[in-house]
């Protein structure tokens, strides 16, 4: 994968997350902001999830209250380089815990 393809795929991921949060109708307030390639999700309780791209490694990084995760693209899924879990699964787990209710990015 070259740098431009990586950026296109990361931008697509950011857009999907932003669209899901815009459409989300849960009880708690969740805000999403993109600034300089960093996507920040802020929850009503003040906690945050930070998602950024690491261009030199062609990775997406996810920082949550539970820890930090690095993802490589395998096929059409971003996969954690340690646990083998998908980006969406880990993001949903963290967002659900931090929001206090089920949050889905599917």
UniProtKB/Swiss-Prot annotation:
HAMAP family: CyaY. The gene is cyaY. This is Iron-sulfur cluster assembly protein CyaY. Interacts with IscS. Certain pairs of proteins can bind simultaneously to IscS; IscS-IscU-CyaY complexes can be isolated in vitro, but (IscS-TusA-CyaY) complexes cannot. Belongs to the frataxin family. Keywords: Iron, Metal-binding. CDD domains: Frataxin (cd00503). InterPro entries: CyaY (IPR047584), Frataxin/CyaY (IPR002908), Frataxin/CyaY_sf (IPR036524), Frataxin_CS (IPR020895). It comes from Escherichia coli O157:H7.
């Amino acid at each position: 994968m070259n740098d431009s393809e990586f950026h296109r795929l990361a931008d697509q991921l950011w857009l999907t997350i932003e669209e899901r949060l815009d459409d989300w109708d849960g009880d708690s307030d969740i805000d999403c902001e993109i600034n300089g390639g960093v996507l920040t999700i802020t929850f009503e309780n003040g906690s945050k999830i930070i998602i950024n791209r690491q261009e030199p490694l062609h990775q997406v990084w996810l920082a949550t209250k539970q820890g930090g995760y690095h993802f490589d693209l395998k096929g059409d899924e971003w996969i954690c380089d340690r646990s083998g879990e998908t980006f969406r699964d880990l993001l949903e787990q963290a967002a659900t815990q931090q929001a206090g209710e089920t949050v889905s990015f599917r």
